[in-house]
From Swiss-Prot:
It is a lipid-anchor; GPI-anchor. Its main location: secreted. A lipid is attached at residue 139 (GPI-anchor amidated glycine). Keywords: Cell wall, Glycoprotein, GPI-anchor, Lipoprotein, Membrane, Secreted, Signal. It comes from Saccharomyces cerevisiae (strain ATCC 204508 / S288c). This is Cell wall protein YLR042C. Residues 140-161 form a propeptide.
Amino acid sequence: MKISQFGSLAFAPIVLLQLFIVQAQLLTDSNAQDLNTALGQKVQYTFLDTGNSNDQLLHLPSTTSSSIITGSLAAANFTGSSSSSSIPKVTSSVITSINYQSSNSTVVTQFTPLPSSSRNETKSSQTTNTISSSTSTGGVGSVKPCLYFVLMLETIAYLFS
């Protein structure tokens, strides 16, 4: 009984070591930190209508201002009434892929505008939207592989103990 209990304690240093490695990766890899923010939680973004253009500027939070998202965004429906009493709405978009290429705090994405003759054409100069995304808890390529590696080491150690 005591031997098996001491054997189970051997997993603790392995787990702690892996957790330290993961934390070090997240602290030293700015892309991992940005991905953690972009993919790990719901964040408020602001779309700015540039007038005649269909381009919308997506302002990132200060935590991700060091990088620009150039990957694809899921299509969003831009709906709402042109009357001042109605608030235009943007449906939730999902970030499907992300590339970090330069230091910039904005990203340009395209929306399909309603016909100019439509009474529902959006005239608002500013709307907000919540983009919900993956439930990943860390940078892509750093947290999950390390977690699987820890589980693999624990399984092997258990089988040979």
